[in-house]
Amino acid sequence: MNLTKMAVFAASLFCLACKNDIDTELEKKSIPESEIQKSEEKLPNEEELTPTDPDEETNKEETVTANATYDFTGNTPPPAPQGMKWVKISQLSDEFNNGFNTDKWTKSLWNYGVPVQMKAENSGVSDGKLWIKATLGNDPERWFETSRVMSKAQVNYPMYTVSRIKGAHISAYNTFWLNNGNISNRNEIDVIENNSNPSCNCQPDFPWQMNSQYFHVVNDDTKRNKGNFDNRELSDANPLKGVAWNEEYHTFGVWWKDATHIQFYLDGEPAGSVVSARDFTRELNIIWDLWTVDADWLGGLAKKEHLSNNNINTMKIDWIHTYQLVEE
């Protein structure tokens, strides 16, 4: 074995050891089943209760530029800072080609407000896709049957996660978010809360608007700001520019850079950002869910007749890739 091959072999062993160390630490941090439901709760009407603070800083350090090169598939993480590299976290990455991996994911079924009813059977994996389906139930109050999938492992900054998602075409939030805590004390990053088919006739931009934000709550004192981005503002070369959330799969990502800086991504491009008014202090779980409420800020209540249409009532997740930023 010559010196070059020996160097490459040694580097490979180092990378493998680094990856294994990250996954081992995540396994240690995975929360037990008994604590999952207690770890996250939020009101369904928080948008009304916690308006954006106009005084909070917005991070403008990353914007789409005409001469930049982007991977529109979303498969490539953002360029790592000098002296750093991205290492994939297997516990928080999945192609969903081998069924529902119960070592990585759990169905966390606490309810939002009416009409939502979380049910285990309304989510699963088939044909290489994780899916969450909204169906019509018989309960007169909780008739919107749906589900939620959450990671067992937790993660902290600096990290990047990206998921390829096609939204259900009903008036509901198709979500991809990170959270840890309860209504009174929590850290939360909402990568998307997307609704391609608002029923209220009051959210004309929603089919293309990426609703992204953070919540930082301490003893019921809420700090919040949004970094919403419209996919019609993607670069002209991006084939997904102006394509509604239900029409094609899009990739949605977030680079959680440090205790305050959060950069969102859409189809490989920077897509809005926020700077938290308080330091994030918690390790977060990754979550997908699908839910509705009778409120204009969500886009209006889902129509019952849409829940019986299997062509539009299902959110589909093709894959998720999550990375930790480490020193080279």
Curated annotation (Swiss-Prot):
Residues 26-61 are annotated as: Disordered. Residues 26-45 have a biased composition (Basic and acidic residues). It catalyses: Hydrolysis of (1->4)-beta-D-galactosidic linkages in agarose, giving the tetramer as the predominant product. The active site is at E188, E193. One of its GO terms (biological process) is carbohydrate metabolic process. Transmembrane segments: none annotated. PROSITE patterns: GH16_2 (PS51762). It is found in: Secreted. GO terms for molecular function: beta-agarase activity. GO terms for cellular component: extracellular region. Residues 70-328 form the GH16 domain. Its EC number is 3.2.1.81. Residues 18-67 form a propeptide. Residues 46-59 have a biased composition (Acidic residues). Keywords: Glycosidase, Hydrolase, Secreted, Signal. Gene3D superfamilies: 2.60.120.200. Induction: When cells are grown with the low sulfated agar. Substrate binds at residues 110, 119-129, 133-135, 188, 193, 224. Belongs to the glycosyl hydrolase 16 family. Cleaves the beta-1,4-linkages between beta-D-galactose and alpha-L-3,6-anhydro-galactose residues in agarose. Cleaves agarose in a random manner with retention of the anomeric-bond configuration, producing beta-anomers that give rise progressively to alpha-anomers when mutarotation takes place. This is Beta-agarase C. It comes from Zobellia galactanivorans (strain DSM 12802 / CCUG 47099 / CIP 106680 / NCIMB 13871 / Dsij).
